[in-house]
Curated annotation (Swiss-Prot):
This is Large ribosomal subunit protein bL9. Belongs to the bacterial ribosomal protein bL9 family. Disulfide bonds: none annotated. Binds to the 23S rRNA. PANTHER family: 50S RIBOSOMAL PROTEIN L9.
Length: 171
């Protein structure tokens, strides 16, 4: 299937790119998510005319996303959860939990699909989580999962001492 991207797609292309993709990928993902349109003759002509408008719109979106990135950068999200004796959570911390808490902290709606987790968080500790705000821009957030506020503070102190030790080594 031949498509034209109308939004940038990570690891695929930028606005206005004409690509051949698998039929299922185009029909089931790119077209319904309004990331692309079919590459018909009329659409190709239309895209050539509107490419500058799309690029200007993308720059505007990117500038807005960079502002959000500065708000997100260096955020530390603390989750207090019940655990078993061996620090395993009863349940897990999911990308939706992280998106909800982050949205509340920065007063901007972050979708759970923007939160990139390799797997759900199922034990206490400190985790780094990637937030994909734009096809080319990601932010890193620290997630702390603990049994109590005091344990979360201990994790924070431990992380600060590790960071200061890393800085001393690099100098």
């Amino acid at each position: 299937m031949e498509i034209i991207l109308i939004k940038p797609v990570r690891k695929l292309g930028k606005i206005g790119d004409i690509l051949k993709v698998a039929n299922g990928f185009g029909r089931n993902y790119l077209l319904p998510q309004k990331l692309a349109i079919r590459a018909t003759k009329s659409n190709k002509e239309l895209i050539v005319k509107q490419k500058h408008e799309f690029e200007a719109k993308d720059k505007q979106i990117r500038a807005e996303v960079e502002k959000i990135n500065t708000l997100i950068k260096d955020q530390q999200l603390v989750f207090i959860r019940q655990t078993s004796d061996d620090c395993k959570l009863f349940g897990s911390v999911t990308n939706k939990d992280i998106a909800d808490k982050l949205s509340k902290n920065i007063s901007y709606n972050i979708s759970h699909s923007n939160v990139i987790l390799d797997k759900q968080i199922k034990s206490t500790g400190i985790y780094t989580v990637e937030i994909r705000l734009h096809a080319e821009l990601t932010a890193i957030v620290t997630v702390i999962v603990a049994r109590s506020d005091s344990e979360a503070q201990d994790y924070l102190r431990e992380q600060k001492t590790e960071n200061s030790a890393d800085l001393a080594e690099s100098e």
